[in-house]
Amino acid sequence: MTKLWGGRFTKPADKTAEGFTSSLAFDRRLYKQDIRGSIAHVRMLGRQGIIPAADAARIEQGLREIEAEIEAGQFPFRQEYEDIHLNIEKRLIEKIGPAGGRLHTARSRNDQVVTDVHLWVKDEIAAVQRLVSDLQGTLLDRAREQMGAVMPGYTHLQRAQPVLLSHHLMAYFWMLERDYGRFADALRRADVSPLGAGALAGTTFPIDREFTAAELGFAGVYPNSMDAVSDRDFIVEFVAAAAICQMHLSRLAEELVMWSSTEFGFVEMDDAYATGSSIMPQKKNPDVAELVRGKTGRIYGDLMALLTVLKGLPLAYHTDLQEDKERLFDAVDTLKACLTVMTGMLATLKFNRERMAQAVRRDFSNATDMADYLVKKGMPFREAHEVVGKAVLYCVERGKFLADLTLEEFKAFSALFEADIYQAIAPETCVSQRTSLGGTAPAEVERQLALAAEILSRRMG
């Protein structure tokens, strides 16, 4: 089988080497972007008079027919043609004859391939952002629904201070909002056209790079042809943003795993998002959440693999860069799957509000409020901290909690305590008094919910 680049060679490729260098198995998913790029390129060639207008029209029609063949499952993919790009070009020549060979005028696979990847990344950033917004919408819905539910807030995985469940859920909304912004930032670097850079040095033909960039919807063009064909920063940035987003999903998944355990009992997974045991009939395992957590390492690995491929490459193009696609595709596919399944899991999650309320009543998470009570009575905070610490120790030694103490016991620690201490350290008071901006007081959480709803409303148009 004659290679499109075979003029220089005197013998065919070794079959093992041919299979080793082929990227068709994974880059065939770029067919839409490849055809889009080729149509823009051939329109420019015809417009500039570089090839006959009639040939440009025949090539465009042939490319559209090839796209239809691929989508109908009728395209004859051939591994010996190495990749999706040469498969399409070879098929074009078969369909329309020698005129198809004009398509690659003033173009190299170096700028062709990276143009395809730029287009794919732009498409996928938009898809990921939609999924992020969907998950944010579900978090917002559940936070509204659970407004008023009080639970322990944690530091060091120890009960720290009471918070609203809605406040806790909204923390993840804002993490995802930063993720959305990171993807938007990554889009700016992806939204630049390398098409027309050639192999590395540009071309001798009078091409119009601004025309092809506009045809493809790019915001601009690379100003340096060597940078254009060798840049993979935009891939690294996208995958880095994906890794950070996946880290947030992993943190949420970890909390759901813990909260669904008997030891916490704060939530129950819907049966559709849990599995059983092959030996223990009683088990209901949070496998979906565990897999979201586990797949985080996979995306981190994709990011590290990309950085390692790039770290020692001199300018300009090297076939090492073929290794970028599988890592990119895997990271994006994994993130999209995790965002989708997490949205469904959260939408169907059952919250045990009573169990959360019981937990917050039988702990010392109101100790800070007891100290604040003394400070408001005029005691310096450090002294109040010491007094409350001793009261906590007293309770621990006697199997009590602060709310169990009699007024006489309170007064043994400080004469400033009055009967209003019981109201001051009630969980509902602890929550409602935290009215600082961004705090867990109901009014502040309602403000968060309104702001979040406004953000999503603007985004959804």
UniProtKB/Swiss-Prot annotation:
Subcellular location: Cytoplasm
Enzyme Commission code: 4.3.2.1
Database matches in InterPro entries: Arg_succ_lyase_C, Argininosuccinate_lyase, Fumarase/histidase_N, Fumarate_lyase_CS, Fumarate_lyase_fam, Fumarate_lyase_N, L-Aspartase-like
Annotated GO biological process: arginine biosynthetic process via ornithine; L-arginine biosynthetic process
Keywords: Amino-acid biosynthesis, Arginine biosynthesis, Cytoplasm, Lyase
Cleavable signal peptide: none
GO molecular function, one term: argininosuccinate lyase activity
Principal subcellular localisation of the protein: cytoplasm
Enzyme class: lyase
GO cellular component labels: cytosol
Keyword Metal-binding included in the entry's annotation: no
Catalytic activity line of the entry: 2-(N(omega)-L-arginino)succinate = fumarate + L-arginine
Pathway given in the UniProt record: Amino-acid biosynthesis; L-arginine biosynthesis; L-arginine from L-ornithine and carbamoyl phosphate: step 3/3
Keyword field contains Amino-acid biosynthesis: yes
Family classification: Belongs to the lyase 1 family. Argininosuccinate lyase subfamily.
Entries under PANTHER family matching the protein: ARGININOSUCCINATE LYASE
Name listed for the protein in its UniProt record: Argininosuccinate lyase
Organism of origin: Symbiobacterium thermophilum (strain DSM 24528 / JCM 14929 / IAM 14863 / T)
